[in-house]
């Protein structure tokens, strides 16, 4: 068995993220037990931020 750069390519076999039970996205980290998308396993509230949505300013810029 050789060591060094050639053997580092063998470290990408498994998958870190599986399907989340709460949001259904493939973002649940297996070792951390936390969903990167919705925050399941870390908090009971859905993970959301203000920068996810465009800000509404005035009458001409309505966002649905």
UniProtKB/Swiss-Prot annotation:
Chain sites annotated for binding Zn(2+): 20, 23, 35, 38
C4-type Zn finger ranges: 20-38
TM segment ranges: none
Molecular function GO terms recorded: rRNA binding; structural constituent of ribosome; zinc ion binding
Matches recorded under SUPFAM superfamilies: Zn-binding ribosomal proteins (SSF57829)
GO terms of biological process kind: translation
Known cofactor(s): Zn(2+)
GO cellular component: ribonucleoprotein complex; ribosome
Keywords: Metal-binding, Ribonucleoprotein, Ribosomal protein, RNA-binding, rRNA-binding, Zinc, Zinc-finger
Cofactor: record remark: Binds 1 zinc ion per subunit.
Pfam families: Ribosomal_L37e
Entry similarity comment: Belongs to the eukaryotic ribosomal protein eL37 family.
HAMAP family: Ribosomal_eL37
Function: Binds to the 23S rRNA.
NCBIfam families the record matches: PRK04179.1
Protein name (Swiss-Prot/TrEMBL): Large ribosomal subunit protein eL37
Organism: Methanococcus maripaludis (strain C6 / ATCC BAA-1332)
Organism classification: Archaea, Methanobacteriati, Methanobacteriota, Methanomada group, Methanococci
Gene giving rise to this polypeptide: rpl37e
